[in-house]
């Protein structure tokens, strides 16, 4: 699925647009370093795209990422 066809959110606006109101630095960390899953040990990174110098994710990408993490920690 192409991130560009989804509801884009500038990472700088994540506090007002994403569930849980994560800070910009937290979203950047999730995108760059990811979160290691408890069951598999895999690192799950939040999908991002740069448009110019602005980093974007999407509501749908956040949902997919959080679903993967939920499975890892249940």
Give the location of each predicted region.
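A short, Lys/Arg-enriched interface patch at domain edges and termini
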Residues: 53-74
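Major-groove DNA-recognition helix of helix-turn-helix-type DNA-binding domains
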Residues: 17-56
């Amino acid at each position: 699925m192409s991130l560009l066809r989804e509801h884009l959110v500038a990472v700088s606006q994540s506090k007002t647009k994403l569930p849980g109101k994560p800070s910009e630095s937290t979203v950047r960390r999730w995108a760059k370093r990811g979160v290691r899953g408890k069951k598999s040990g895999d690192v799950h990174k939040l999908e991002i795209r740069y448009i110019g110098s602005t980093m974007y994710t999407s509501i749908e990408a956040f949902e997919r990422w959080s679903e993967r993490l939920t499975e890892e920690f249940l």
